[in-house]
Curated annotation (Swiss-Prot):
Origin superkingdom: Eukaryota
SS bond partners: 26-51, 49-394, 307-372
Lineage: Eukaryota, Metazoa, Chordata, Craniata, Vertebrata
Key words of the record: Apoptosis, Carbohydrate metabolism, Chitin degradation, Chitin-binding, Cytoplasm, Disulfide bond, Glycosidase, Hydrolase, Immunity, Inflammatory response, Polysaccharide degradation, Secreted, Signal
Record's GO cellular component terms: cytoplasm; extracellular region; extracellular space
Purpose of the protein: Degrades chitin and chitotriose. May participate in the defense against nematodes, fungi and other pathogens. Plays a role in T-helper cell type 2 (Th2) immune response. Contributes to the response to IL-13 and inflammation in response to IL-13. Stimulates chemokine production by pulmonary epithelial cells. Protects lung epithelial cells against apoptosis and promotes phosphorylation of AKT1. Its function in the inflammatory response and in protecting cells against apoptosis is inhibited by allosamidin, suggesting that the function of this protein depends on carbohydrate binding.
Phenotype when changing residue 45 to D: Increased chitinase activity
Protein name listed in UniProt: Acidic mammalian chitinase
Record's subunit section: Interacts with EGFR.
PANTHER family: ACIDIC MAMMALIAN CHITINASE (PTHR11177:SF188), CHITINASE (PTHR11177)
One GO MF term: chitin binding
Swiss-Prot/TrEMBL catalytic activity: Random endo-hydrolysis of N-acetyl-beta-D-glucosaminide (1->4)-beta-linkages in chitin and chitodextrins
Length: 476
């Protein structure tokens, strides 16, 4: 459908859009600040024009209320959400949970209606206070790892209650509704024991499928972190450990394709080979490979650490059946993703009409561009280009010519009016509204633009009307 899309305050360009845009969701981890040297990553290192959604990992829980974890989370929140001042289309979410968080805090919280209500109330207050646009659940996993079977249903109940509370709160304060998303399992047994897929999908805005960590040193043989397809020798449950099978399992069991977001890892799993001369897929291993100098995690290398491994003479191979690379040197073997595999997966994603890509994590890509000689954020940039987001607008909130605010003293009139015309409005319209665009009553050609509580009125070009379904100027 041809639309005229608003880019900045009064600037409109003709943009041909075919269907809805893909999501490119990137996780930021609040422990990346502790990596040494060039590995240290802060919110200021994020390119605000790279991803459509950013998720801050992680928040914690205390007394059934959401809390900070790191000593400087509040400061980091400010910088993280401040990125929206450079990209008016960017959405930010806060994730709660994670692998190390475990299941017990979630189990306790969902166990009673009172506990759930306490949590939901705290989440709304917390997200509004720190200017996030939504919450991402990272419960690993309902019904597994010590979580009782009833948590499968109670997770649905929690998400439903939270979605309904978000809708009610948005109406009460006349702000855009907070989003609710979830990072979900890729292991079939964890999916079956953890999620009521059709019901859960009804209430979640997006479902971030963690299609990585599919193989690792815990298995005792080499394997790819995030293979697109199964390996020819994969049998039994091993045949399920690939992106294609997992994503289609979610879709075939009741999740709408457009809500399913495919997980992309910017890291690899490394191994110690039992026999350095046996370097193929499925070769015996004796444990996790060495920690890298920056991520400092045994068995895992950031993409930029893998680039150093390759530069130092490692042999690179291509796992053709699974469409992903691997590399080895001496007794160390690593399975990972690169630009080629990211592009192949992105084309597959589009062919299957999934909703977009999710990246774990933005701080593990070569964000400085100094390790891989492929520019900054080479992997995520590959996704951005492949998903057609390369030309998407990235502009700061508009600075209109004349804001609708109280006139300076001595000007002789009560309140200004926009030089772009439109129906009259007062300075109080945006005082209780989130940043964004809003329709003007009785004037379809005009719209309000709220920026940090200040009200601006702007008009669409002649013949166009403001369309709330896309926050754009559209044909009447």
């Amino acid at each position: 459908m041809t639309k005229l899309i608003l880019l900045t305050g009064l600037v409109l360009i003709l943009n041909l859009q075919l269907g809805s845009a893909y999501q490119l969701t990137c996780y930021f981890t609040n422990w990346a600040q502790y990596r040494p040297g060039l590995g240290r990553f802060m919110p200021d290192n994020i390119d605000p024009c790279l991803c459509t959604h950013l998720i801050y990992a992680f928040a914690g829980r205390q007394n059934n209320e959401i809390t900070t974890i790191e000593w400087n989370d509040v400061t980091l929140y400010q910088a993280f959400n401040g990125l929206k001042n450079k990209n008016s289309q960017l959405k930010t979410l806060l994730a709660i949970g994670g692998w190390n968080f475990g299941t017990a805090p979630f189990t306790a919280m969902v166990s009673t209606p009172e506990n759930r209500q306490t949590f939901i109330t705290s989440v709304i207050k917390f997200l509004r206070q720190y200017e996030f646009d939504g919450l991402d659940f990272d419960w690993e996993y309902p019904g597994s790892r010590g979580s009782p079977p009833q948590d499968k249903h109670l997770f649905t109940v929690l998400v439903q209650e939270m979605r309904e509370a978000f809708e009610q709160e948005a109406k009460q304060i006349n702000k855009p509704r907070l989003m609710v998303t979830a990072a979900v399992a890729a292991g079939i047994s964890n999916i079956q024991s953890g999620y009521e897929i059709p019901q859960l999908s009804q209430y979640l805005d997006y479902i971030h499928v963690m299609t990585y960590d599919l193989h690792g040193s815990w298995e005792g043989y080499t394997g790819e972190n995030s293979p697109l397809y199964k390996y020819p020798t994969d049998t039994g449950s091993n045949a399920y450990l690939n992106v294609d099978y997992v994503m289609n399992y979610w879709k075939d069991n009741g999740a709408p394709a457009e809500k399913l977001i495919v997980g992309f890892p910017t890291y690899g799993h490394n191994f110690i080979l039992s026999n350095p001369s046996n370097t193929g897929i499925g070769a015996p291993t004796s444990g996790a490979g060495p920690a890298g100098p920056y991520a400092k995690e045994s068995g895992i290398w950031a993409y930029y650490e893998i680039c150093t491994f390759l530069k130092n003479g490692a042999t690179q191979g291509w796992d053709a059946p699974q469409e992903v690379p691997y590399a080895y040197q001496g007794n160390v073997w690593v399975g990972y993703d690169n630009i080629k595999s990211f592009d192949i997966k992105a084309q597959w994603l589009k062919h299957n009409k999934f909703g977009g890509a999710m990246v774990w994590a933005i701080d593990l890509d070569d964000f400085t561009g100094t390790f891989c000689n492929q520019g900054k954020f080479p992997l995520i940039s590959t996704l951005k280009k492949a998903l057609g987001l390369q030309s998407a607008s990235c502009t700061a909130p508009a600075q209109p010519i004349e804001p609708i605010t109280a006139a300076p003293s001595g000007s002789g009139n009560g309140s200004g009016s926009s030089s772009s015309g439109g129906s009259s409005g007062g300075s109080g319209f945006c005082a209780v509204r989130a940043n964004g665009l809003y329709p003007v009553a009785n004037n379809r050609n005009a719209f309000w633009h709220c920026v940090n509580g200040v009200t601006y009125q702007q008009n669409c070009q002649a013949g166009l009307v403001f369309d709330t379904s896309c926050d754009c100027c559209n044909w009447a």
